[in-house]
Design a protein with these regions (language model features):
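Glycosyltransferase specificity loop/lid
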Residues: 1-122, 128-140, 147-148, 268-321, ...
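Residues that mark the start of a beta-strand
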Residues: 2-5, 232-234, 325
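Short, basic, glycine/proline-bearing loop/turn elements
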Residues: 9, 81-87, 103, 159-164, ...
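Donor-nucleotide binding loops and adjacent catalytic segments primarily
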Residues: 24, 201-306
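Proline-centered loop/turn at the N-terminus of a beta-strand
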Residues: 127-129, 186, 231, 268, ...
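A conserved, positively charged/aromatic
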Residues: 145-151, 180-182, 301
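A nucleotide-sugar donor-handling region in carbohydrate enzymes
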Residues: 153-241
Length: 335
């Protein structure tokens, strides 16, 4: 049997883990030695409930990171996003060293990654085969998040200079763009050519929508008790707050808009927050709102009449493709 290490950008939301956990679970069920790495609270909860091993954060001092959240939330493409988030050479060096420790200590035969810049660089440094599991607009050949705006503007931020300095220190050839480091020995694209189009020259395998739900997962009785005399709307906010202060990446706007639009409507609303707490400003929800930190996505999508979400790729896969549920996704421009 083989050893597989699943890595990702360690964001505190469920978008990336919900595409990797199903693959990891299948490999573990087949007897392979499987580990996942995402210590953020919400992903860690999902990984634990899937019965998978989540590796701890390697012990290494890390510098403060500086991120331009406004540019991250409005980035033209992944290259600008990485430039806005990972422009500090000191942070790139420390993050790369941490991920080299992680990969070396576990000793995988294969790294399976989704959007983890530093785990991809670590795999190159240690010469471990890399499988990249990406949505179409994360792929290096993509036209970006706002492709309809035409030609990409010149002079957008890039992390290439910082990344190449650290890569050279570790004997890895430079890249033209930092996004090129996501290039795996095998590309698996979550979605279809219609939902996640790429140029014909991109050598990828489309694997369709990947969604997570344990085979025995069912909805709690209180959802069934809501009855069917009124439409059931599922509101999924993703992470309402990514930091102690508001940032442009927060999905709290989804909850605010849903309450404003639906609190007096003749509907039942189920609000889920992906293992996140409901923000304090919503300490008392409207009487027709019902909150759960997490519910199995495919089951909830099949039960609801309408899904309102933050525009995350995995949410689109759950609602529109898996269950054919009408959806409104007001935040992410690429969807």
């Amino acid at each position: 049997m083989s050893k597989f290490l699943f890595t990702m950008l360690p964001a505190n939301d469920l978008g990336l883990p919900t595409r990797l956990v199903p693959i990891a679970r299948v490999l573990a069920d087949r007897g392979h030695d499987v580990a996942v790495f995402n210590p953020a609270p919400a992903p860690a909860r999902l990984i634990e409930e899937a019965g998978l091993k989540n590796l701890p954060m390697p012990s290494r001092a890390m510098p403060d990171s500086w991120t331009d959240s406004a540019q991250v939330s409005s980035a033209w493409d992944v290259e600008q996003l990485f430039g806005a988030a990972f422009g500090s050479e000191e942070f790139v060096r420390a993050s790369t060293a941490l991920h080299v420790d992680l990969v070396r200590d576990f000793g995988p035969d294969v790294v399976v990654d989704s959007f983890g810049l530093f785990s991809c660089l670590a795999a190159r440094i240690l010469q471990v085969p890399l499988v990249s599991v990406l949505q179409g607009n994360f792929h290096p050949a993509s036209d970006g998040f706002v492709w309809w705006k035409g030609e990409r503007p010149a002079g957008l931020p890039s992390a290439a200079a910082a990344v190449n300095k650290v890569a050279a220190e570790n004997g890895v050839a430079p890249v033209v763009r930092s996004v090129d480091l996501l290039a795996g020995d095998l590309y698996l694209i979550v979605g279809t050519p219609e939902t996640d189009p790429l140029p014909a020259t991109a050598v990828v395998a489309y694997i369709g929508p990947i969604v997570w739900q344990r085979g025995n997962d069912t909805l709690p009785d209180w959802v069934a008790a809501l009855g069917r005399d009124k439409p059931l709307i599922w509101v999924y906010s993703g992470n309402p707050r990514y930091a102690g202060i508001p940032t442009p990446c927060d999905s709290i706007v989804v909850i605010r808009a849903a309450i404003a639009a639906l609190s007096d409507a003749p509907v039942q609303v189920v609000l889920t927050t992906g293992y996140q707490d409901v923000p304090k400003e919503f300490s008392t929800l409207p009487s027709n709102f019902h909150h759960a930190a997490y519910l199995p996505g495919p089951a909830m999508a099949e039960r609801c009449d309408l899904m309102v979400h933050h525009g995350g790729h995995s949410s689109v896969m759950v609602g529109m493709i898996t269950a054919g549920v009408p959806a409104d996704n007001p935040v992410m421009t690429e969807l």
